[in-house]
A protein has these predicted regions:
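Interfacial transmembrane-helix boundary/kink motif in multi-pass membrane proteins
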Residues: 2-18, 41, 67-97, 241-244, ...
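C-terminal membrane module of polytopic membrane proteins
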Residues: 211-313
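Alpha-helical transmembrane segments in multi-pass membrane proteins
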Residues: 17-62, 245-254, 313
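Membrane-interface helix/loop boundary segments of multi-pass membrane proteins
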Residues: 139-164, 191-198
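Small-polar-interrupted transmembrane alpha-helices in polytopic inner-membrane proteins
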Residues: 157-177, 186, 207
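Functionally important transmembrane alpha-helices
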Residues: 23-26, 178-242
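Juxtamembrane helix-loop-helix connectors linking adjacent transmembrane helices
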Residues: 33-43, 70-139, 154, 302-313
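Hydrophobic residues within alpha-helical transmembrane segments
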Residues: 15, 45, 135, 164-168, ...
Length: 313
């Protein structure tokens, strides 16, 4: 697997998403309902569409030197128990940064998570905790920190492999709100994988992050808080006032998260690999950007822009 194959994977992923949206729209207009569409079906279809091209490409274009099982090829290595608990700390330390980025994006676009909260809350808590908090994160990490990141890593410096896999992770969400903080999460999770040497670390962190959001959503509902109505009541001035404190907290918490990454690298005996991320950033192997990647990025940004413009009308 290399960058060229990875770029085709992402283009396939985006095109499949577009095809799914068109088919669903046609079925809705024509009154054709093969099954009841709800948030659960939407989430399941989205993950399957994302996983399909990644699995097919990973199996079909596995390098001759990669003779092990797929889980070994993608970096599903064991981590120490102490590292497992420090990943919890790392995940909560990066939350102020993601919250601040989310709030900044809300100055311009709608909060996508809040927008679907009503649909989510109609489902049983255990079902949504599994789908959003466990299944979704596993699929996304398998694709972006597994197949895509490692494909780029075979072609270029780790520094740029982390950047490109994070950028594509953000674009995959196909909306500016989630993309704003998904890119930051992607970079931090990429660093986490390099610090521990295991894809399980980012899977665990992603599960903690999403599960935390799901729990907050249901707790708010338990206390009769209407998230959608609360967001509509937010003014620009209120958002700007909230961003400041979050940025201050993030300015303290994010460096601490980096310290945790350094500790994890030492704990997993990967100090040399982790330190080389920045040192080897100018090393060149193969071109990481190709025509399929450019096409995929243009399609993603065009869709996101169109959705944003339509929301303003």
């Amino acid at each position: 697997m290399n960058s060229k194959k990875v770029n085709w994977i992402f283009l396939s992923l985006i095109l499949l998403n577009m095809l799914m949206y068109v088919l669903m729209l046609v079925c809705y207009v024509q009154g054709i309902l093969l099954f009841e569409m709800n948030i659960l079906v939407n989430l399941l279809l989205a993950q399957l569409v994302m996983m399909l091209p990644a699995i097919l490409f990973a199996l079909a274009f596995r390098r001759k030197t990669e003779t092990g099982h797929l889980n070994e090829m993608l970096g599903f290595h064991k981590i120490r128990v102490s590292s497992f608990f420090m990943i919890f700390l790392f995940t909560y330390l990066i939350m102020p940064l993601t919250t601040a980025l989310n709030a900044i994006s809300m100055l311009f676009v709608e909060n996508e998570v809040t927008a679907i909260s009503g649909d989510v809350l109609q489902m049983p808590f255990p079902v949504m905790l599994f789908m959003i908090g466990m299944f979704g994160p596993f699929c996304e990490e398998f694709v972006f920190r597994g197949v895509i990141f490692r494909g780029y890593k075979n072609s270029g410096p780790v520094f740029w492999s982390i950047f490109w896999s994070a950028l594509l992770f953000g674009l995959m969400h196909l909306n500016f709100n989630q993309a704003a903080y998904a890119v930051a999460i992607g970079i931090l999770f990429g660093l986490l994988v390099e610090a521990t040497g295991s894809l399980w670390s980012s899977v665990i962190a992603h599960m903690i992050f999403n599960s935390h959001q799901v729990c907050l959503m249901y707790l708010s509902d338990l206390f009769q808080a209407d998230l959608a109505a609360a967001e509509e009541a937010l003014t620009q001035e209120m958002l700007i006032a909230a961003i400041g404190p979050y940025l201050i907290i993030a300015a303290v918490a994010t460096p601490l998260a980096v310290c945790v990454l350094v500790w994890l690298a030492k704990n997993e005996r990967r100090e040399a690999e982790f330190c080389s991320i920045w040192a080897c950033r100018k090393m060149k192997k193969e071109a990481m950007v190709s025509i399929p990647l450019i096409i995929a990025i243009v399609i993603s940004l065009a869709y996101m822009s169109l959705e944003w413009i339509l929301a303003l009308l």
